[in-house]
Curated annotation (Swiss-Prot):
Keywords: Ribonucleoprotein, Ribosomal protein, RNA-binding, rRNA-binding. GO terms for cellular component: cytosolic large ribosomal subunit. HAMAP family: Ribosomal_uL14. Binds to 23S rRNA. Forms part of two intersubunit bridges in the 70S ribosome. The gene is rplN. Belongs to the universal ribosomal protein uL14 family. GO terms for molecular function: large ribosomal subunit rRNA binding; structural constituent of ribosome. Part of the 50S ribosomal subunit. Forms a cluster with proteins L3 and L19. In the 70S ribosome, L14 and L19 interact and together make contacts with the 16S rRNA in bridges B5 and B8. It comes from Syntrophus aciditrophicus (strain SB). GO terms for biological process: translation. PROSITE patterns: RIBOSOMAL_L14 (PS00049). This is Large ribosomal subunit protein uL14.
C-alpha cells in the first residue's frame, strides 16, 4: 500500500537507488497504490554516471509491497520491502535487469517485459 511521500527501493539497474512517490495514477482522488499499479516518482538517491539523476520525475510500477496482497485463491503474499521498477512513458522498463522477486500480479497488468527480466516470480 503506497501513497504520496512513500520512499521505495528501486529494483532495477537504471541507476536510481531510492524514489519517492509523488502521485498515484488512476483516478482524481486515488490515495493508495498496490502491486502492479503505476505511480509518478521523484528520484531521491541515484548512482553517479547513471541513466537517471537525482531530482528526475519518472513513472514507476510497483513490484513488491510490505502490505500483503490477497490472491483469488485466498492466499496472501507480502514482501520485506516496498520496491518499484522505473518505466518509460511507453510502459517499458528503463533498466535492463531486475533485482529480487516480483509478484505474479504484474502479468495481469501486461508488464511482460518485467516478468521476463525478473529472476523469480512469486
Amino acid at each position: 500500500m503506497i501513497q504520496m511521500q512513500t520512499v521505495l527501493n528501486v529494483a532495477d539497474n537504471s541507476g536510481a537507488k531510492k524514489v519517492a512517490c509523488i502521485k498515484v495514477l488512476g483516478g482524481s482522488k486515488r490515495r493508495y497504490a498496490g502491486v502492479g499499479d503505476v505511480i509518478v516518482v521523484a528520484v531521491k538517491e541515484a548512482m553517479p554516471n547513471s541513466k537517471v539523476k537525482k531530482g528526475d520525475v519518472m513513472k514507476a510500477v510497483i513490484v513488491r509491497t510490505a502490505k500483503e496482497v490477497r490472491r483469488q485463491d485466498g492466499s496472501y503474499l507480502k514482501f520485506d520491502d516496498n520496491s518499484a521498477v522505473l518505466i518509460s512513458n511507453q510502459m517499458e522498463p528503463i533498466g535492463t535487469r531486475i533485482f529480487g522477486p516480483v509478484a505474479r500480479e504484474l502479468r495481469a497488468r501486461q508488464f511482460m517485459k518485467i516478468i521476463s527480466l525478473a529472476p523469480e516470480v512469486l
